[in-house]
């Protein structure tokens, strides 16, 4: 199953985008760009070796993806999840969840969020996962929030948060060999 491909993304352009994608099987690809003021969506994956690259405000032509509510949920191994929100302009309200169900091993999650009020929850229940998280933008009045939960062994987590004030991280890990 493919939405977009490795070199060309599918695109939604307009004020509001609502997107729901379910993919079952191995080696699914989602490469999607959203250019607009508001994004609400859910991506559900079942299978191994899936590749998701979701960009909200990738060109900056139609607002800033100012409001985004994104959920990416998967069960499977060796998935590559890349979520970028507010790439060219700081978003004002972001609520994003990345959830790996029990048995989700050897996954890579990269999330770059640029926003004033950014809530990013990552919950993955599996072993040997790698997280690269960058939350940027102006903090203050409930800005920069990361809630991370990890169950399983061997997690490599890199988190960068920046801005002024409101930099909150809640982190729970379980298992051995966590490199944070």
Language-model features: where?
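Low-complexity repeat regions of mature extracellularly deployed or surface/particle-associated proteins
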Residues: 1-180
């Amino acid at each position: 199953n493919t939405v977009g491909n490795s070199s060309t993304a599918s695109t939604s352009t307009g004020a509001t985008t609502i997107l729901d994608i379910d993919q079952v099987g191995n080696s699914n690809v989602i490469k999607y760009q959203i250019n607009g003021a508001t994004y609400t969506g859910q991506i559900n994956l079942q299978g191994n070796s899936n590749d998701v690259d979701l960009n909200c405000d990738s060109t900056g032509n139609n607002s800033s993806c100012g409001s985004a509510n994104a959920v990416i949920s998967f069960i499977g191994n060796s998935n590559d999840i890349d979520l970028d929100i507010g790439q060219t302009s700081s978003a004002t309200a972001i609520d994003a969840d990345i959830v790996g169900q029990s048995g989700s091993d050897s996954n890579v999650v990269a999330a770059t969020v640029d926003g004033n009020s950014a809530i990013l929850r990552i919950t993955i229940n599996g072993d040997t996962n790698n997280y690269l998280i960058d939350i940027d933008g102006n903090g203050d009045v409930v800005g920069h929030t990361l809630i991370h939960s990890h169950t399983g062994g061997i997690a490599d987590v890199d988190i960068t948060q920046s801005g002024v004030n409101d930099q909150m991280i809640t982190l729970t890990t379980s298992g051995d060999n966590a490199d944070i």
